[in-house]
Amino acid sequence: MGTEVKLLVGLGNPGPEYERTRHNAGFWLVDDFCRRHAITLSPDTKSKALIGRWQQGAHDLRIVLPQNFMNRSGFSVAALANFYKIPANEILVAYDELDLPPGVAKFKKGGGAGGHNGIKDIIAQTGSQDFMRLRIGIGHPGDKTKVTGFVLGKASANEQRLIDDCIDEASRSIDTLMAEGWGTALQRLHSYRPEQKG
């Protein structure tokens, strides 16, 4: 039995200058999902986002990349959730996670923002913490004062390869989540190990 996911959200900052920065890992994941399923995203002025739709069998999934900056991501999510009457527990948000190393991604249900401004704004705008999360590891600079520069910087070639490979697996795990459910998707993604290349 699959898990209902009605809204897939990728977090990032809009604009070419941010495209390859670590903070845009959520965008990368949604782009990968859309590429695999031949989904086209189009601008929507009301929700200030790029939006798309994927229908297969019983699944009817809306996809959103907010085009406000990260700390205003909640506007787009709340606007679309309200319009399509999607409850928080049927929303899946993909975003970059400092507390996981590159090459690791984890599903999570509910909880606080963990210092992530995009998640913080979604909680504030939707009034709920109950949405599912897909946390994509980007690593940590080791010093709290360096976090802003780190997330807005580009990963090294090796880190980027680890992140990209992991995103491919995480994107496929969303298919597993909808087809086979939370437990199977968790098992698949959480047992993934990146290939280390010398």
UniProtKB/Swiss-Prot annotation:
Catalysed transformations (reactions): an N-acyl-L-alpha-aminoacyl-tRNA + H2O = an N-acyl-L-amino acid + a tRNA + H(+)
Per the UniProt record, the site (Stabilizes the basic form of H active site to accept a proton) maps to D96
Alphabetical list of InterPro entries matching this protein: Pept_tRNA_hydro (IPR001328), Pept_tRNA_hydro_CS (IPR018171), Pept_tRNA_hydro_sf (IPR036416)
Which family, according to UniProt?
A: Belongs to the PTH family.
Question: What's the superkingdom here?
Answer: Bacteria
Its job: Hydrolyzes ribosome-free peptidyl-tRNAs (with 1 or more amino acids incorporated), which drop off the ribosome during protein synthesis, or as a result of ribosome stalling. Catalyzes the release of premature peptidyl moieties from peptidyl-tRNA molecules trapped in stalled 50S ribosomal subunits, and thus maintains levels of free tRNAs and 50S ribosomes.
| HAMAP family reported for this sequence | Pept_tRNA_hydro_bact
Q: Catalytic residues?
A: H23 (proton acceptor)
| Name of the molecule in the record | Peptidyl-tRNA hydrolase
Which positions in this protein are listed as binding tRNA?
Answer: Y18, F69, N71, N117
Broad class of where this protein is predominantly found: cytoplasm
Which organism was this protein described from?
A: Idiomarina loihiensis (strain ATCC BAA-735 / DSM 15497 / L2-TR)
PANTHER family in the cross-refs: PEPTIDYL-TRNA HYDROLASE (PTHR17224:SF1)
Q: Where is this site: Discriminates between blocked and unblocked aminoacyl-tRNA?
A: N13
